[in-house]
């Protein structure tokens, strides 16, 4: 167990106080009084910050309540035909129930389908240690400082990327190891296209590597597929699509990926 989780460790070993739930309930009940006291007594900059925070909380709560109320609204459908024309009088009494909840649930379902995980070609990859990923760069007059690190793997940086000042740059991404394009294979069509990389979506090694844009085997990247002429069911052109890297770019010198369709 990590060193900073000693409280959780103690709870697991010895349990909680017998009156823990009661104390927690009372603490939560006192919270409103404490907030009220702070709102009345705090002045100056602290008072302004507190008021700003409370205002944001109230706005968020009102939005949440309004959204919850709208999701349960039921009412008659508008007297309009599907093509936007007014219904004749003899059809006005045939009101079809319009349930906002059903609409919102269908939208949620679509979002879930969109966010659904792909069955990736490489479900498991080898772990990479920090010693393998980073090389220590010694700096200073006598080369005694060792706080800088250089990434030894291929990386992707965006179009408008600029390096930080050398004195403050802790992690170096060498220009020679930066990739802008990838050889992407379409699994159904069986064609390979040289497409530009848009972003690094997920590196399976660590969230930090995702943030740094490190390209290793199994990494999910977003590529520009506008050249393939792919369209959605609604007829819109697809620009970005996810692909998984299937090779080791630092060994091959290029990025090979399979499109996730």
UniProtKB/Swiss-Prot annotation:
InterPro entries the record matches: NSA2_fam, Ribosomal_Se8/biogenesis_NSA2
- Keyword terms: Nucleus, Ribonucleoprotein, Ribosome biogenesis, rRNA processing
Checking Pfam families in the record gives:
Ribosomal_S8e
The UniProt annotation puts motif Nuclear localization signal 2 at 51-58
Residue spans of biased composition, Basic and acidic residues class: 7-39
Major site of localization recorded for this protein: nucleus
Q: What Gene Ontology cellular component terms go with this record?
A: nucleolus; ribonucleoprotein complex
Domain of life, per lineage? Eukaryota
Which cellular compartments is it found in?
Answer: Nucleus, Nucleolus
The keyword Transferase appears for this protein: no
Biological process terms in GO annotation? rRNA processing
The keyword Ribonucleoprotein is assigned to this record: yes
Specify where the region named Disordered lies, as residue ranges.
Answer: 1-39, 62-82
Gene3D superfamilies associated with the record: 2.40.10.310
Task: List where the motif Nuclear localization signal 1 lies.
Answer: 15-22
Q: Which family does it belong to?
A: Belongs to the eukaryotic ribosomal protein eS8 family. Ribosome biogenesis protein NSA2 subfamily.
Biological function: Involved in the biogenesis of the 60S ribosomal subunit. May play a part in the quality control of pre-60S particles.
Its quaternary structure?
A: Component of the pre-66S ribosomal particle. Interacts with NOP7 and RRP1. Interacts with RSA4 (via WD repeats).
Please give the name of this protein: Ribosome biogenesis protein NSA2
Native species: Kluyveromyces lactis (strain ATCC 8585 / CBS 2359 / DSM 70799 / NBRC 1267 / NRRL Y-1140 / WM37) (Yeast)
Q: Species lineage, top-down?
A: Eukaryota, Fungi, Dikarya, Ascomycota, Saccharomycotina
